[in-house]
């Protein structure tokens, strides 16, 4: 579906491009143009650091307003319809078929602080207008945008989005930038950080929104840089959640992940206003199609010939096109010259001017050329280089001649002069560095040192370099690891020294005996020295540390210097006082050799030259090559430290002169070799490409030989010789065909190995007899001679016999087949035919009906298992189960996977209708469970019934502890069954809770039928007692009113009450007195009563004991009440926790979103019930207290009655009755306490039940909190331990830092010492500078004296007199003239040599290019190398041309100056002496210039030097000097620079054309490869018609 859409887009884009071709010009005038505005991210590659689907994983989609509803799906990168890769971020955004990228879920750890990066590579810089993201899930809580302004550059923050800006990104939440602030700073906003919407939320970032300079964009480089980006990165930091992830529910965690359906970047291809479109170049890279004479990927540069003004960005006001250079039609090349632009307003500086012209605009003639008219070409002056003062002529072509020379071109001598040379006859010009004596008095030839040659000993012999006066052999032999005898002094090296000062220690020096054993070494801090003391006559040596060893080849011919003294001058020298070891060699020398002194008690300086010459008697004698080889791998320097027994030797400062790369005083003794074929490197130490070591064990000393590659490679590994095989060959020497090719590779042609006609480039073989090519290694899954068939276990149609060709793929049977079986799947369709492990389906990817499990599990035991559903607990007609979990469909209140058990609190599974509820009474049963078959509940003692809902017969007090037995007295009770309060129904005359006592005024007759009424007289007593009880009750009521204060009693009322009480007491007293008047019978009866009273006293004591027991029971009741309160409080706490948890969760049921949920109501009801029970407990406690007070009051009244002795047995009976009441109240209190306890337990149970009902919300209970607290405590303890360890580590670090501090202090001291040394060196340099300035001053004074003498010289003839003034002026410029001549000749040689090398390099490059043409298929690397070589060659030619121009200009100036000296040729002795002194200065300046060719420069310097040493002018010697200069001029003239430059330019042009052709061929090949890769990538990776196994 996407292909037609892309085709339409391509047609639209093509039309847009064609329409935009002329947007950069309007009627021929340039104007600002820009590429079209595009989605730069469309079909661009996005790299994601995390993507779901590997391995397949489940995710859940949140729906609804709050995301409560979830549907779960599978993300599988191996299945097309289930994958969500990063490529879906930038594909076509089809709303009808949405595709999206998706990360792993929070269950896999995707949450802050872990992050996910989505990196978009645009392939080129774009001006970004906006970045838009469309999220398939809810937008993140925190994410950020970053950009890069160039490839491989740093990531720059672009924008932050976060609901917690300060916490997450340390940024304030704001959406704009104030004027004056940095406009390139990224802002943070919470605009798009809400969790809603759950899908389809957009985030659009505008790059210029909120930035003050956006309205002046063209004049804001800051914002121009801000909108530029080559790459965009989205960093996802924190997911948005509903907060329910804290409970770690897997299903909840699977619902949180990142998912983005569209990633768009709006902008324009960045072309700086100089292009209207972007295209792909030959390397398939996006670049601007530049106009306005610009080029570059962003049109950021001017074309080579359009440099007349600096490049600028095009604006709406000015297109700022690049302007062409003004070269007057004589050049097509130029560069931008800033200085020229500042001074003239035009910066185009022309190069390569034609017609021998020069100047920034080719407006004048080159040096040594002239013309009479500006419109004419310039002609060569052709001045004789020997006889002319300058090679530059005037506008008429006339040259200025030297003294004694004549002719228009100064090509012949004047009369009286001969031997036309540069300066006439001059003194003997022997070079002091290369000669040993003066020259031959007759021939002028000098006597040279051993390694020096030349007429004046001015050059080194072949195989030697660096002419050095201090070298007894004159020149140093070339080392070059023995591979070359041609070398010269290398540039870029400076003099350096390896030094040990012993100011801070031994600095790595050790001591050894002669046999190599270690010896004690001491550091003498006072004198900054190290010392050894020998206990015998055997010498002890100081051993140099590693910095003096290794590759010390740069110290060859230099000095090893050290200071040494002995404790006692009793020395016995030997031939091995100084020993050098290395490369298997060992040489030594006595201490007094090379002019050094005997050791003494005073410190002396010893200097040894590291040279094998006989003047420095190193023994044994070795060749120069062996000595240098030893220094290349110096392993030991041993300085003898003891020269007598028990005498100490002290070694002080040690220094070894060497050379290192860098700026400073040059070190000309370092060589650079001219390597023969097969060698490269400064010292020819490496094999050239195409060569290898003949003997790798010899390292750089081994010869290099050609690679042996059977004609299939030009290069090989220089060490191992393994070839870089081409032409489809392989092997160390390309002796066989590569895998996938066949043939004979030893033939040596490019077509030796042909590709095997096998799929996938697999290997093949040729049948010798039939010559038939047969595939030997078919791709996995194929078979046949040409791999045309699918193998067993694979399916497909490789030849397309049944439709479109399809590659063979392995049958996907989910590992649920027998791999040893044949025919597991259909070879054409791939359908699995032999599923095992109870699996089925097209791919054996689901369980068979009646089975469940994970068919994709690795363990067969965990695959599909039988459902085995219980027939009694399963819904009728359902034989299967859930294929994933195995859960059978159970009847109501039936549980377990196989529906084999009732839920807790249910029974009767065998009914086939589901389980029935037990309905056990909450107080009567021990638990809510019952017998699963009968339904009988487990009852408390004394309780019966199937639901434990009633007491057993003859029991009472139904409660959580069971029922108590009535224990009714069978004699006094009408029935053994008591009432609910435990009181039995008594017969007449019986009282008491158990009917075991007689009623008042009744007595127990043991022989009679129970309790019988007392005689009638006792009724009077009873009546009186009742009367007293009434009064006592009134008194109690009065006291109660007084104690409770319910009435507002005034004083009068209180007194009235007191009077009434007093009256009642008096009446009572009168009644008591009247009782004395009774008859004797009454007295007798009172005696009986008295006897009875005694008995009652005993009972009273028992009553007291019982009262104490009652108090104890009351206290126990109070304790139980307190326990009950504690249980209620605990229940309240649990309820509050549950309530808080419910409030925090705020679950809204699907059927209602406004009413509180049932659990909250139940929790509130339980809370109220607990509070009500708690109030009842308080009331019971109050009643218990009142009962206790009543018992105490009864005891007090009883004691009062006993004390008065007037109380009657009726009072005792009253007390008994009150005691019985108190006891009953206590029992009732106990009963109520039990009831409250039972109700509290029931409330607790209901709270626990409510708590248990909260399983659908997070499990918040005290156990979990306690476990969490324990975990936190454990973590705290671990943290404490970690802190302790860190403290110990910190202490260790402090100790280590103290050591480091000492080291730093030592280094600082050493640095100060080195600084002092540097100061000393600077002081010495300043002194040398002062001496040089003094010498220069003396030179100027001498020159002034010479000028004074010159003013007094006589005139030779009329011509001399006419030019005397000019001659005097010219004479003062002799030093500059001589220096100019020297530099001119030097640069002439440099130009010749460089041009020769450049020409050779060009020919070599051309040859390589021709060879590369034959290898076009693999030429990319060589073509790049050839192009680089051509560029380097062209650069060298350009540089040489510039140097040649400078040289010719200097020669012109020299000739102009020498021409003015023509009249002074016959100067007298004083004039020659002055010229000689001036020439010395020229020699000094010439020696400081750079020299590439030592021959000519050395010759001129030596001539000038010898001239300065003569006291008079020798005409013969001047002739020799002039001849030498003449030769140099001829070399310059014969060099034919113009022709060579033209040839080199032509070769470079041809080479560039060839390289362009190769580049085009390579680009075509690369495009073909890319096309094949695209075709390969479009092939399906799997079967797209895979049926969905399980609907989400």
UniProtKB/Swiss-Prot annotation:
Region (Domain II and I): 1013-1592
Origin: domain of life: Eukaryota
GO BP: cell adhesion
Disulfide bonds: 269-278, 271-288, 290-299, 302-322, 325-334, 327-350, 353-362, 365-378, 381-393, 383-399, 401-410, 413-425, 428-439, 430-446, 448-457, 460-475, 707-716, 709-723, 725-734, 737-753, 756-764, 758-775, 778-787, 790-808, 811-825, 813-832, 835-844, 847-864, 867-881, 869-888, 890-899, 902-915, 918-930, 920-937, 939-948, 951-963, 966-978, 968-984, 986-995, 998-1011
Compositional bias annotation for Polar residues: 1476-1489
Glycan-modified residues: 43, 117, 559, 633, 1005, 1041, 1048, 1090, 1144, 1158, 1188, 1206, 1253, 1363, 1386, 1477, 1487
Chain ranges of the Laminin N-terminal domain: 29-268
Record keywords: Basement membrane, Cell adhesion, Coiled coil, Disulfide bond, Extracellular matrix, Glycoprotein, Laminin EGF-like domain, Repeat, Secreted, Signal
Signal peptide: 1-19
A GO CC term attached to the entry: extracellular region
Main location: secreted
Region spans: Disordered: 1456-1489
CDD domains, per database record: ATP-synt_Fo_b, EGF_Lam
SUPFAM superfamilies: EGF/Laminin (SSF57196), Methyl-accepting chemotaxis protein (MCP) signaling domain (SSF58104), Tropomyosin (SSF57997)
PROSITE patterns in the cross-refs: EGF_1, EGF_2, EGF_LAM_1, EGF_LAM_2, LAMININ_IVA, LAMININ_NTER
Function as written in the Swiss-Prot or TrEMBL entry: Binding to cells via a high affinity receptor, laminin is thought to mediate the attachment, migration and organization of cells into tissues during embryonic development by interacting with other extracellular matrix components.
Assembly: Laminin is a complex glycoprotein, consisting of three different polypeptide chains (alpha, beta, gamma), which are bound to each other by disulfide bonds into a cross-shaped molecule comprising one long and three short arms with globules at each end.
Protein name per the record: Laminin subunit gamma-1
Gene behind the chain: lamc1
């Amino acid at each position: 579906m996407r292909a037609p859409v892309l085709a339409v887009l391509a047609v639209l884009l093509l039309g847009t491009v064609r329409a935009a071709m002329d947007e950069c010009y309007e009627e021929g005038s340039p104007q600002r143009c820009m590429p079209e505005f595009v989605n730069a991210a469309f079909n661009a590659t996005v790299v994601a650091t995390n993507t779901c689907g590997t391995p397949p994983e489940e995710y859940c989609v949140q729906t609804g307003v709050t995301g409560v509803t979830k549907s779960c799906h599978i993300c599988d990168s191996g299945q097309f319809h289930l994958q969500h890769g990063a490529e879906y971020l930038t594909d076509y955004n089809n709303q009808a078929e949405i595709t999206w990228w998706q990360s792993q879920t929070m269950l896999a750890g995707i949450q802050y602080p872990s992050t996910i990066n989505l990196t978009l590579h645009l392939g080129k810089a774009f001006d970004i207008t906006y970045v838009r993201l469309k999220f398939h899930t809810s937008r993140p809580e925190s994410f950020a945008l970053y950009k890069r302004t160039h490839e491989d550059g740093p990531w720059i923050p672009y924008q932050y989005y976060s609901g917690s800006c300060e916490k997450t990104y340390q940024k304030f939440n704001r959406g704009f930038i104030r004027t004056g602030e940095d406009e390139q700073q990224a802002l943070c906003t919470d605009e798009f950080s809400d969790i809603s919407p759950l899908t389809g939320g957009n985030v659009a970032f505008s790059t210029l929104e909120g930035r003050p300079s956006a309205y002046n964009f063209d004049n804001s480089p800051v914002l121009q840089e801000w909108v530029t980006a080559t790459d965009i990165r989205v960093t996802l930091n924190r997911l948005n959640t509903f907060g329910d992830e804290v409970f770690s529910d897997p299903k909840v965690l699977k619902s949180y992940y990142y998912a983005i359906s569209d990633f768009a970047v709006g902008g324009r291809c960045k072309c700086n206003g100089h292009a209207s479109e972007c295209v792909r170049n030959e390397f398939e890279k996006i670049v601007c199609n530049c106009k306005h004479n610009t080029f570059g990927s962003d049109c950021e540069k001017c074309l080579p010939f359009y440099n007349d003004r600096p490049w600028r960005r095009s604006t709406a006001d000015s297109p700022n096109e690049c302007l062409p250079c003004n070269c007057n039609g004589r050049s097509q090349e130029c560069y931008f010259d800033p200085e020229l632009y500042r001074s003239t307003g035009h910066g185009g500086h022309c190069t390569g001017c034609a017609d021998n012209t020069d100047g920034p605009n080719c407006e004048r003639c080159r040096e040594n050329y002239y013309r009479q008219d500006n419109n004419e070409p310039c002609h060569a002056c052709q001045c004789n280089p020997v006889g002319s003062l300058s090679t530059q002529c005037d506008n008429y072509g006339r040259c200025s001649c030297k003294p004694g020379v004549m002719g228009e071109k100064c090509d012949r001598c004047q009369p009286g002069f001969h031997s036309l040379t540069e300066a006439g006859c001059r003194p003997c010009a022997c070079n002091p560095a290369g000669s040993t004596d003066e020259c031959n008095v007759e021939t002028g030839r000098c006597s040279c040192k051993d390694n020096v040659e030349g007429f004046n000993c001015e050059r080194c012999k072949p195989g030697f370099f660096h002419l050095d006066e201090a070298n007894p052999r004159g020149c140093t032999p070339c080392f070059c690891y023995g591979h070359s005898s041609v070398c010269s002094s290398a540039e870029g090296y400076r003099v350096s020294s390896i030094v040990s000062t012993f100011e801070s220690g031994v600095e790595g020096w050790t001591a050894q005996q002669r046999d190599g054993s270690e010896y004690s070494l001491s550091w003498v801090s006072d004198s900054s020295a190290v010392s050894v003391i020998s206990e015998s006559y055997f010498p002890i040596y100081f051993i140099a540390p590693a910095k003096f060893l290794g590759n010390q080849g740069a110290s060859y011919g230099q000095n090893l210097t050290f200071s040494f003294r002995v404790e006692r001058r009793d020395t016995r020298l030997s031939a091995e006082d100084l020993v050098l070891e290395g490369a298997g060699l060992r040489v030594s020398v006595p201490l007094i050799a090379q002019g050094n002194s005997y050791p003494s008690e005073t410190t002396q300086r010893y200097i040894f030259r590291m040279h094998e010459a006989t003047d420095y008697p190193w023994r044994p004698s070795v060749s120069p090559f062996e000595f240098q080889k030893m220094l290349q791998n110096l392993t030991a320097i041993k300085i003898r430290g003891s020269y007598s027994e028990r005498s100490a030797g002290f070694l002080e400062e040690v220094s070894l002169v060497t050379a290192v790369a860098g700026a400073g005083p040059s070190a000309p003794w370092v060589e650079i070799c001219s390597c023969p074929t097969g060698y490269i490197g400064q010292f020819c130490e490496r094999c050239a490409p195409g060569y290898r070591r003949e003997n790798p064990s010899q390292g750089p000393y081994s010869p290099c030989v050609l690679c042996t590659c059977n004609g299939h490679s030009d290069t090989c590994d220089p060490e191992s010789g393994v070839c870089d095989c081409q032409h489809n060959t392989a092997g160390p020497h390309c002796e066989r065909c590569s895998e996938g090719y066949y043939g004979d590779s030893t033939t040596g042609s490019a077509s030796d190995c042909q590709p095997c006609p096998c799929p996938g480039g697999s290997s093949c073989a040729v049948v010798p007899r039939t010559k038939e090519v047969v595939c030997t290694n078919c791709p996995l899954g194929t078979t046949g001679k040409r791999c045309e068939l699918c193998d067993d276990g694979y399916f497909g149609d490789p030849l397309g016999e049944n439709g479109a060709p399809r590659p063979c793929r392995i049958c996907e049977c989910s590992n649920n087949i027998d791999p040893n079986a044949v025919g597991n799947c259909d070879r054409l369709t791939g359908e699995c035919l032999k599923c095992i492990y109870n699996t089925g389906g097209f791919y054996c990817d689901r369980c068979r009906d009646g089975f469940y499990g994970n068919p994709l599990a690795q363990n067969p035991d965990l695959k599909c298992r039988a459902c085995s559903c219980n027939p009694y607990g399963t819904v009728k007609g359902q034989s299967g189960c859930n294929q994933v979990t195995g859960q059978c469909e159970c009847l109501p209140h039936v549980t377990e996977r196989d529906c084999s058990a009732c839920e807790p609190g249910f029974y009767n599974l065998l009914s086939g209708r589901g389980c029935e509820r037990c309905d056990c009474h909450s107080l009567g049963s021990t638990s809510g469970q019952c017998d699963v078959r009968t339904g009988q509940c487990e009852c408390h003692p004394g309780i019966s019934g199937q639901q434990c809902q009633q007491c057993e017969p003859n029991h009472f007090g139904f409660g959580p502890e069971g029922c108590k037995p009535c224990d009714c007295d069978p004699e006094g009770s009408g029935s053994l069954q008591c009432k609910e309060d435990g009181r039995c129904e008594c017969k007449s005359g019986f009282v008491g809770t158990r009917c075991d006592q007689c009623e008042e005024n009744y007595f127990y007759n043991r022989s009679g039928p129970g309790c019988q009424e007392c005689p009638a007289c006792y009724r009077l007593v009873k009546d009186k007692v009742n009367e007293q009880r009434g009064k006592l009750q009134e008194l109690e009521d009065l006291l109660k009113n007084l104690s409770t204060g319910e009435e507002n009693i005034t004083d009068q009322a209180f007194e009235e009450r007191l009077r009434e009480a007093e009256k009642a007491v008096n009446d009572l007293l009168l009644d008591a007195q009247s009782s004395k008047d009774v008859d004797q019978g009454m007295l007798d009866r009172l005696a009986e009563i008295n006897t009875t009273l005694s008995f009652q006293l005993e009972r009273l004591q028992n009553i007291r004991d019982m009262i104490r027991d009652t108090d104890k029971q009351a206290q126990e009741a109070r304790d139980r009440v307190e326990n009950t309160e504690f249980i209620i409080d605990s229940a309240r706490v649990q309820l509050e926790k549950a309530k808080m948890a419910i409030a925090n969760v705020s679950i809204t049921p699907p059927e209602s979103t406004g009413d509180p949920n049932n659990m909250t109501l139940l929790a509130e009801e339980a809370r109220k019930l607990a509070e009500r029970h708690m109030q009842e407990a308080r009331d019971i406690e109050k009643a218990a207290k009142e009962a206790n007070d009543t018992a105490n009051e009864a005891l007090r009244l009883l004691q009062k009655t006993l004390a008065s002795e007037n109380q009657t047995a009726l009072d005792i009976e009253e007390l008994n009755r009150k005691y019985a009441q108190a006891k009953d109240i206590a029992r009732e209190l106990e009963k109520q306490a039990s009831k409250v306890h039972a109700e509290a337990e029931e409330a607790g149970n209901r709270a626990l039940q409510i708590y248990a009902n909260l399983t659908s919300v997070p499990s918040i209970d005290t156990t979990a909190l306690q476990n969490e607290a324990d975990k936190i405590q454990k973590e705290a303890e671990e943290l404490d331990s970690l802190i302790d360890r860190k403290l110990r580590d910190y202490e260790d670090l402090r100790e280590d830092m103290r050591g480091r501090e000492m080291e730093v202090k030592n280094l600082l001291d050493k640095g100060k010492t080195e600084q002092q040394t540097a100061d000393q060196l600077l002081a010495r340099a300043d002194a040398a500078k002062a001496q040089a300035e003094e010498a220069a001053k003396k030179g100027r004074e001498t020159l002034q004296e010479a000028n004074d003498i010159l003013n007094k010289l006589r005139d030779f003839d009329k011509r001399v007199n006419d030019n005397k003034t000019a001659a005097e002026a010219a004479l003062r410029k002799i030093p500059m003239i001589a220096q100019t001549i020297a530099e001119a000749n030097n640069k002439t040689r440099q130009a010749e040599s460089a041009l020769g090398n450049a020409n050779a390099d060009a020919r070599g490059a051309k040859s390589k290019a021709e060879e590369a043409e034959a290898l076009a298929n693999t030429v990319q690397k060589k073509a790049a190398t050839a192009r680089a070589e051509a560029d380097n060659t062209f650069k060298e030619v350009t540089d040489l041309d510039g140097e040649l121009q400078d040289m010719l200009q200097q020669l012109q100036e020299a000739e102009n100056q020498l021409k003015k000296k023509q009249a002074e040729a016959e100067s007298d002795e004083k004039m020659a002496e002055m010229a000689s002194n001036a020439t010395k200065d020229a020699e000094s300046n010439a020696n400081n210039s750079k020299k590439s060719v030592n021959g000519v420069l050395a010759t001129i310097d030596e001539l000038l030097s010898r001239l300065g040493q003569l006291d008079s002018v020798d005409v013969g010697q001047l002739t020799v000097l002039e001849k030498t200069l003449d030769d140099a001029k001829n070399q310059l003239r014969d060099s034919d620079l113009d022709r060579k430059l033209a040839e080199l330019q032509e070769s470079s042009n041809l080479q560039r054309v060839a390289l362009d052709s190769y580049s085009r061929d390579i680009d075509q090949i690369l495009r073909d490869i890319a096309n094949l890769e695209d075709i390969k990538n479009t092939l399906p990776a799997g079967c797209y018609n895979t049926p969905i196994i399980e609907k989400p």
